[in-house]
């Protein structure tokens, strides 16, 4: 989903409940191939990174458009590109739909994609990763490797209640400055956002799950 600039304090939900909440809304999408044909026609060969999900081609996820629900797909696409891998956005989106990782509330895709499915998706497509549901453990790893080129995917609540949805981004640490560089901070972003650390960007009480992608 997209992130807005209005945030409030949120008491963390129990991990088991959060996983259940996402899993019960996952659905297979029978029109994935039809979406793929449309999405492929929108994807330029030189599309590059997605800096904001509302300022890129408006691909279709389930029955919804990219701007409101496409952050997990954008994060996966950006992260794979950060690893130097060839990545087709249309193919990634189709494969998430076919795997049943896209969520449905009232219509297919209106709840985005289950963030806990990202690790399974990456591994099924040849990219190893380490998943973190413990915020402190992830923050420690990111601090330890801040001066290395490391690629991450981060999911977190983006408003004061679960009903405001969550946001998922790709990020990397740079040996040039030791900072965290984030793609798609807001859905209308046009460049990377830079933070000193995980804690500078994502508060502990909003964290859902994170992934450290391992280079081939």
Name the predicted role of every residue range:
Residues 2-107:
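Active-site-adjacent structural segments surrounding the nucleophilic cysteine of cysteine proteases
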Residues 81, 86, 91-215:
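Conserved active-site-adjacent core of cysteine acyl-enzyme catalytic domains
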């Amino acid at each position: 989903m997209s992130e807005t600039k209005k945030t409030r304090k949120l008491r963390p939900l129990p991990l088991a409940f959060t996983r259940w909440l996402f899993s019960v809304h996952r659905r297979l999408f029978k029109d994935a191939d039809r979406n793929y044909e449309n999405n492929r026609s929108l994807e330029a060969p030189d599309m590059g990174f997605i800096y904001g999900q509302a300022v890129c081609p408006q691909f279709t996820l389930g029955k919804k458009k990219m701007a409101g629900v496409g952050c997990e797909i954008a994060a996966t696409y950006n992260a794979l590109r950060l690893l130097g891998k060839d990545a087709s956005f249309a193919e990634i989106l189709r494969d998430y739909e076919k795997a049943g990782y896209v969520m449905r509330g009232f219509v297919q895709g209106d709840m985005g994609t289950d963030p806990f499915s990202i690790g399974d998706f990456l591994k099924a497509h040849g990219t190893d990763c380490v998943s973190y549901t413990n915020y402190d453990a992830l923050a420690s790893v990111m601090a330890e490797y801040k001066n290395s080129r490391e690629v991450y995917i981060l999911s977190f609540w983006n408003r004061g209640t679960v009903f405001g949805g969550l946001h998922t981004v790709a990020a990397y640490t740079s040996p040039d400055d030791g900072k965290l560089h984030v793609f798609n901070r807001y859905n209308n972003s046009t460049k990377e956002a830079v933070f000193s650390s995980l804690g500078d960007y994502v508060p502990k009480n909003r964290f859902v799950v994170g992934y450290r992608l391992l280079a081939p």
